[in-house]
Amino acid sequence: MASFFVSKDVEKRVCGLGEILLLAIRRGFREYPSPWAVASKEIYVRHAAISITLAFAMIFFISVVAAPSPVQASEKENSVTLVALGDSLTAGFGLQPADGFTPKLEAYLRARGHNVRVVNGGVSGDTSSGGLARFDWAVPQDAHAIIIELGANDALRGINPNLTRANLTKIIEKSKDRGLSVLLAGMLAPPNLGPAYAEAFAAIYPTLAAQYDVPLYPFFLDGVVAQKSLNLADGIHPNAAGIDIIVSRIGPYAERLISNAASRE
């Protein structure tokens, strides 16, 4: 097995005929001296000609091995891009990158045979207003499906539920205008805001899901909220084990979502 560097960040490894060619190129550059090290014009010309030939051979070889195979190209064409637009619960606040919601959801879906890429569209501290404001640039143009996970910070700040509903309405409409398959993730308000606020807030999600005929995952933190062993020290954000619970519960909803998105392509 031989290797060469395409750039400072990319190393290619080759074997078989590719290894033979690469080793031959290396020998050529070792055996033929630099024009600055010899006085003979003949050696210089021969070295230059061989160097140019080998350089073109190397360029051709790199272009061949670096080009995506038909299988890779086909997989990319058939893949589904799912974006999770949300707040710190989506962003993976306080967690190692691999322990966040989006990478674990992608792993869950891929383990079940889905060719999917899950994009982290979460911003810690974001409200529904913030999610709406950044929708156009936060949701990739090549996205096929979206999970909308917003509203927790609205409730924590006591924002008028009517404003939250209006923002989520616009996000759903923008998603549908883009042709995205939508999964709406519900949220509940903390009890300290009183029963009237909690009731008005909780009604936002099923109402919008029915109005726009989109699937609803009733409560994003189902099975995790108020469980000390499943949350960080702040008692609000899930830890890695908590994320596992969330993914296992929302996972089947996400499977149906991307299957629906794939069938519409």
Regions found by a protein language model. Name each.
Residues V71-S124, R134-D142:
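Serine-esterase "nucleophile elbow" of acetyl-processing enzymes
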Residues T53-V64:
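Bacterial N-terminal signal peptides
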Residues R46, K104, A111-H114, G130-E265:
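Alpha-helical cap/lid subdomain in secreted, periplasmic
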